[in-house]
């Protein structure tokens, strides 16, 4: 982990509320790792690392003042990272993600043999070379018709996680969890999750967990 000062290169709108933010600087990270970025007068926020147009990039869903500042106003952004356990796996995998994880998919494609399914509630405003599904009905249809893979990795909303777990139970499924966190180093304990081995923390034990490790009830 190191202190970061990132220079925003440009932003690209993905859909109604999600943007890709590209940076000038290169960061050495493993697929699935994340950074904590600082916003004015607000707590740090976690963003999974990835690539877009061969630049280090993050996907940002605008939910409030902090994420709006990153997309619209920021020129330089302080932070620290990379953080988390990352992920590398042999064989052929399927990433099932929301638009907030688009840049992560590019990091996986650089290191592993993967296909990608992107599920969104609203239409995309940029062309994608992934399989896409807009709306719950289309997403469920495409999820049910996916072929067989050696492993699966899901990153999206809690609802997406639960749907994928029900459809893929019995297979080798991993989840990159998105939980609130204030520090990224295990100090604030805000990102606790229940596992079959007890309480773990997304920032230090994850963010990637096997599906059969987690307590789903």
Swiss-Prot record:
Pathway per the UniProt entry: Pyrimidine metabolism; UMP biosynthesis via de novo pathway; orotate from (S)-dihydroorotate (NAD(+) route): step 1/1
Cofactor requirements of the protein: [2Fe-2S] cluster; FAD
Gene3D superfamilies: Dihydroorotate dehydrogenase, electron transfer subunit, Translation factors
Co-factor binding comment: Binds 1 [2Fe-2S] cluster per subunit. Binds 1 FAD per subunit.
Iron-sulfur found in the keyword field: yes
Family under the similarity heading: Belongs to the PyrK family.
CDD domains recorded: DHOD_e_trans_like
Annotated residues for binding of FAD: 66-67
Protein keywords: 2Fe-2S, Electron transport, FAD, Flavoprotein, Iron, Iron-sulfur, Metal-binding, Pyrimidine biosynthesis, Transport
Record-given protein name: Putative dihydroorotate dehydrogenase B (NAD(+)), electron transfer subunit
PANTHER family: DIHYDROOROTATE DEHYDROGENASE B (NAD(+)), ELECTRON TRANSFER SUBUNIT, DIHYDROOROTATE DEHYDROGENASE B (NAD(+)), ELECTRON TRANSFER SUBUNIT-RELATED
Binding of [2Fe-2S] cluster, residues: 183, 188, 191, 203
Secretion signal span: none
Coiled-coil stretches: none
Matching InterPro entries: Cyt_c3_hydrogenase_gsu, Dihydroorotate_DH_ele_sf, Dihydroorotate_DH_Fe-S-bd, FNR_nucleotide-bd, PyrK_electron_transfer, Riboflavin_synthase-like_b-brl
A Pfam family that the UniProt record links to this protein: DHODB_Fe-S_bind
Keyword Flavoprotein included in the entry's annotation: yes
């Amino acid at each position: 982990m190191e202190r970061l000062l990132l220079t925003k290169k440009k932003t690209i709108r993905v859909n109604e509320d999600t943007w890709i933010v590209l940076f000038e600087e290169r960061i050495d990270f493993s697929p699935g790792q994340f950074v904590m970025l600082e916003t004015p007068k607000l707590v740090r926020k976690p963003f999974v690392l990835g690539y877009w147009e061969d630049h280090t990039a993050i996907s940002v869903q605008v939910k409030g003042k902090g994420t709006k500042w990153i997309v619209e106003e920021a020129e330089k952004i302080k932070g620290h990272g990379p953080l988390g356990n990352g992920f590398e796996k042999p064989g052929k995998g399927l990433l099932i993600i929301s638009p907030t994880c688009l840049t992560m998919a590019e990091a996986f494609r650089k290191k592993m043999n993967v296909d990608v399914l992107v599920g969104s509630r609203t239409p995309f405003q940029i062309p994608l070379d992934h399989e896409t599904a807009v709306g719950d009905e289309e997403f469920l249809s495409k999820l049910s018709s996916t072929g067989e893979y050696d492993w699966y990795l899901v990153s999206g909303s809690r609802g997406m996680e639960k749907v994928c777990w029900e459809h893929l139970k019995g297979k080798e499924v991993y989840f990159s969890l998105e939980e609130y966190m204030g520090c990224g180093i295990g100090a604030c304990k805000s990102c606790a999750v229940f596992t079959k081995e007890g309480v773990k923390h997304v920032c230090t034990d994850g963010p990637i967990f096997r599906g059969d490790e987690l307590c789903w009830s």
